[in-house]
A protein has these predicted regions:
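Short acidic linear motifs
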Residues: 1-322
Length: 322
């Protein structure tokens, strides 16, 4: 006989400070939110990415509200995207430097412009996706909708968007030189800096930093190729290369969003652990107490780290935060 105590009946209430943090959610349902375009990017070129993206998020949230996993079946993918195939698998093979990571390689722009010169941009799908990317970076907002999603939900199409960003910049440089790259970067960096402020997820902010780093390295390469800069170049670059401001590097919104995901999915805890869903596990787990512990040990510490200056972080970054 095995006795398993039902610890779940002694679960805690949600901490008041958590309730307060979650009481003012950001509304992603605003005009000009690029997040919907991200979710619609995988659709066939004939479909409107914005319309598809809204339908995808609505489908995911509707399933979560009914207690189902917020994921898409093959049939749902076919109906929403117009296909179940990955339509963006071929052009990255033609231009492999589109996947070049600026964190690991400082020569991404050089490699990509060489590949574009050897094989000019002509793929119909790629040209359609570049047009979609142009639309994305014209949007005034990028706010991920994390409401009523779970840990199995698909992310926005961050990877393909990064690849398109690099191709977009390389094409501008190859066609119009430094002037073209500066003009392209003005629009690109404006969008990504806005995303750095509004992004509701940590992965979104990491992707944004990657995109900005790629833009900076591209500009650095192009500037280095110029024998001298004109006064107009210098003026535009000074405007473009302003340091990030405190509100642009604040990660509180992303941490709160991570906390919200934990709170909304705490009753499905056993669905996400390797042991699987079982009655003994249901007895042993205190879902809300686990969320409270996660908040005190991780989220609250993240808030404290976010308030440190660069020098303080490097000096104290390995010190436990109480």
């Amino acid at each position: 006989i095995v006795f398993i105590p039902n610890l779940s009946i002694f679960d805690e209430a949600l901490l008041p400070e958590i309730t307060e943090l979650l009481s003012k959610p950001v509304n992603p349902e605003i005009d000009g939110n690029a997040n919907y375009h991200f979710y619609g990017l995988a659709s066939v070129s004939e479909k409107d990415a914005l319309t598809v993206g809204k339908a995808v998020i609505h489908t995911l949230q509707s399933k979560h509200a009914k207690g189902e996993s917020a994921t898409l079946t093959e049939q749902e993918r076919a109906e929403l995207y117009g296909t179940t195939d990955n339509l963006d698998s071929e052009w990255p093979e033609i231009y492999p430097a589109a996947k070049c990571s600026p964190r690991e390689n400082t020569g991404c722009l050089e490699k990509l412009t060489e590949q574009i010169k050897a094989k000019p941009l002509a793929d119909e799908r790629l040209l359609a996706q570049l047009n979609r990317y142009h639309t994305i970076i014209q949007q005034p907002h990028m706010i991920e909708d994390t409401r009523l999603l779970d840990y199995t939900s698909p992310l926005p199409a961050f990877g393909p968007v990064l690849n398109l960003s690099r191709l977009y910049q390389a094409a501008a440089y190859q066609q119009y030189g430094l002037e073209g790259l500066i003009s392209s970067s003005q629009m690109d960096m404006k969008f990504w800096r806005k995303t750095l402020v509004e992004s509701q997820t940590l992965i979104g902010r990491m992707i944004t930093i990657n995109a900005l780093r790629g833009d900076l390295l591209s500009l650095s390469y192009a500037i280095n190729k110029m024998p001298s800069l004109t006064p107009a170049h210098e003026k535009n670059l000074q405007e473009l290369l302003k340091p990030l401001l405190p509100h642009e590097i604040n990660i509180d919104a992303a941490l709160i969003s991570e906390l919200r995901l934990s709170v909304e999915n705490r009753n499905f805890y056993s669905d996400y652990v390797s042991e699987g869903n079982s009655l003994p596990l249901e007895f042993l787990v205190q879902q809300t107490a686990s969320v409270n512990l996660y908040y005190k040990g991780t989220i609250k510490a993240g808030f404290a780290f976010g308030k440190l200056s660069s020098s303080e972080f490097y000096e104290r970054g390995q010190t436990p935060v109480k």
